[in-house]
Regions:
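Canonical Radical SAM [4Fe-4S] cluster-binding loop centered on the CxxxCxxC motif
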Residues: 1-12
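Conserved SAM/AdoMet-binding glycine-rich loop
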Residues: 23-137
Length: 137
């Protein structure tokens, strides 16, 4: 499979689009990408999904924000804290685990280990006990 490089849109552009959608009656935003948790790394030099969410929760008219596809290595403590802080952000994480064996994960060129995945899940559960975690194995 061939994939291109990750490309993020500027926070202000996404917020402007969300405001326009809200003005037209949209109530829920679904942020989706091959790996949404990597948002902003290409533009800002660091994972910035938490910063984007902080801006999107201020958009009048938007009731829910759902985010799809979080890879474990980019689920930062700050992202978890931001998701836990706002009722508008759905407590739902779609995190492709793909495998629980470290050697197979290494052969698949994954950037995480089983132990790191468990640590992230524990942190999510600590901050958002009612969070739904969906995965593919």
């Amino acid at each position: 499979m061939i994939r291109g490089h990750f490309r993020s849109r500027k926070i202000e552009d996404i917020v402007e689009e969300a405001e326009n959608l809200a003005k037209n009656g949209v109530k829920e935003l679904i942020l989706i990408a091959q790996d949404t948790s990597r948002y902003g790394k290409d533009l800002y030099g660091e994972y910035s999904l938490d910063k984007l969410l902080e801006k999107l929760v201020t958009v009048d008219g938007i009731k829910w924000i759902r985010v799809h596809y979080f890879y474990p290595e980019a689920i930062t403590d700050s992202l978890i804290d931001t998701m836990a802080k706002y009722d508008k952000i759905c407590n739902y994480i779609d995190m492709p685990v793909q495998h629980g064996n470290n050697e197979i994960l290494r052969r698949m060129a994954r950037r995480t280990t089983q132990e790191q995945m468990v640590e992230r899940i524990n942190k999510i559960r600590e901050k958002m006990p009612d969070c739904t975690i969906r995965t593919s194995i």
